[in-house]
A protein has these predicted regions:
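Extracytoplasmic cell-surface/polysaccharide-interacting catalytic and binding patches
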Residues: 21-251
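Sec-dependent signal peptide recognition
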Residues: 4-10
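C-terminal motif of bacterial Sec signal peptides marking the signal peptidase cleavage site
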Residues: 16-19
Length: 251
């Protein structure tokens, strides 16, 4: 009887110890779970950081690729770059033409130019059938010297090319004239030309505010034949130099 009472008296103590042991295990389990969650969170943060670094590196790589300049080639007569649809001749103050390079007017460019003139005339613009197209090295030398004699070299260099540096020598450039024989400057006709020249494969070569790129003052009358890629250049709003990433500006 005494033993039974002793057991009964000890039973609450035993149950209390068991309960404490269970609580301790649960606490340890919770602590371990928290540790796992914390570790997983840390790993996730590390992964996110790595992904961010990877994205940053990728962006820097793309930026470097975009800023890469186009390779300019020289074949002994002229400089050129490879465009989307073929070779594009570059003639500016940094890229001269050989003195003996005399291709005449490019047949494809001339045909497109004549269509351009005909369409402008049909729309009522006062455009002459006469124009200024191909010029030989010698012709350009005489023309440039006449401007130098009149206004000095510094002034002449802002609007006339020295011999060997003129786009007219490529046979791909044309100056439009009005019916009075003057270079085309009439605002409505000039605006139409600037907006629509690319549909005929041309770009208005010397744009306003782009003297530091092209090397010349704006010329609303001077168009340069490019072909199909003229539309890409027009839509970009860039000069030929800026579009292809080639050096331009002054001599």
């Amino acid at each position: 009887m005494i033993m039974k009472r002793t057991i009964l008296l000890c039973l609450p103590t035993i149950l209390l110890l068991v309960a404490c042991h269970q609580n301790t295990n649960q606490a340890n389990t919770t602590k371990n779970s928290s540790t796992v969650i914390s570790t997983t969170s840390s790993q996730s943060t590390s992964t996110t950081s790595e992904q961010s670094t990877s994205s940053s590196t990728s962006a820097e790589t793309n930026q470097e690729a975009t800023s890469t300049e186009t390779q300019v080639n020289f074949n002994g007569s002229y400089y050129s770059v490879q465009g989307k649809y073929g070779e594009v001749i570059i003639a500016n103050k940094k890229h001269p033409l050989a003195a003996d390079y005399a291709p005449g007017e490019n047949p494809e460019a001339l045909a497109a130019f004549q269509r351009l003139i005909a369409d402008m005339q049909a729309l009522g613009f006062g455009i002459s059938n006469n124009y200024s197209g191909f010029r030989s090295y010698e012709t350009q030398a005489n023309l440039y010297q006449s401007y130098v004699n009149q206004e000095g070299q510094a002034a002449a260099d802002t609007y006339s090319a020295r011999a060997g540096y003129s786009e007219h020598q490529t046979g791909l450039a044309f100056d439009l004239l009005d019916t009075s024989g003057n270079l085309l400057e009439e605002p409505n006709a000039s605006q139409w030309l600037a907006t629509n020249a690319h549909l005929y494969g041309f770009i208005v070569r010397y744009l306003p505010g782009k003297e530091s790129s092209t090397g010349y003052m704006a010329e609303s009358w001077h168009v340069r034949y490019i072909g199909q890629e003229a539309t890409d250049i027009y839509n970009s709003g860039l000069t030929l130099e800026e579009y292809f990433g080639v050096p331009g500006g002054d001599y």
